[in-house]
Amino acid sequence: LHAQLNLLKDAGVDNVAIEASSHGLDQYRIDNINISAAAFTNMSRDHLDYHKTMEEYFKAKARLFKEILPKDGLVVLGIDTIEKKYLKQITDNNKHNIITIGRSESDLQILQLDNLWRHTALRLRVNNQEIDIKIPLIGEFQIHNALIAAATVTVDKHIGIIESLKTLETLKGVKGRLEFIGSNKYDAGIYVDYAHTPDALEFVLREMRKYTAKKLYLVFGAGGNRDIGKRYLMGQVAENFSDVIIVTDDNPRNEDPLKIRLDILMSTKNAIEIGNRYAAIKTAIDQLEEGDNLLVCGKGHEETQEINGKISHFSDHEVINEIYK
């Protein structure tokens, strides 16, 4: 990472935004980087195959704020998506400049959020002003992330918060994050998302429900050689928040794909099991009718699939476009 940042500097790049992974933080790979601002978007179950407990997972994330970010640095916190016990540990006994964002009382407060077709309309309060903006994204979690990003760049004193928020109206969504791919002949929507944890899956299904008049279809699986405990939980989420479930392979890696699918199926009642991901997606698309939506989860932007240690080209986007067109 340090070598790549040095190359960027030599190329004339002055500012960089990076994701500080919990693995990287725990392994001290982010240390000695000149960081001006840090954002904490959410805290939910993930990477427990590595960290073992939520406490150790948080401890790794917290290093960014407690040990790496300078005392005069900017901290941006999404207060709706992080438990208070974690927020308190980040904000207590430090001298950081802090910007909070959320629906409850905060520095950047969401007063109103209206879900429109492929857009979200917002009324916000910031600096004792109320402003209205329309962001070309759906999904409240995506809106929170966009607002956090807009606040974080104000660490550059030449960028005002109102100006930064207004630029969100021209934002292009991230590939594979609640991304609309297209619709079939019945105008049923087909979406792709990277959700691969219980919380993320619940968030995205709850959001999709707002735009689904009839049945919400879900195609998903779980990664191999990762946290086994989340598979049962993801099955529960699928059962509670979708109408038609097809359990398929994600990236089994070196695990038995059938074993992974069975771990998920233990908490579902009427799920369909189709190991081949292409066949699973096709089965779902073929069943879609007017008023339905399909969400294909787990791989998002990825363009490969790993089965039995072999990596092959596979893109949910390409498969969907090939099938429905």
Language-model segments: residues:
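ATP-dependent carboxylate-amine ligase
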Residues: 92, 151-176, 180-325
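Conserved nucleotide-sensing/catalytic segment adjacent to the nucleotide-binding pocket
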Residues: 1-21
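Short beta-strand segments
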Residues: 19, 42, 78, 219-221, ...
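Conserved helix/coil segment N-terminal to the catalytic DExD/H
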Residues: 23-31
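Inter-motif core of Ras-like GTPase G domains
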Residues: 31-43, 213-218
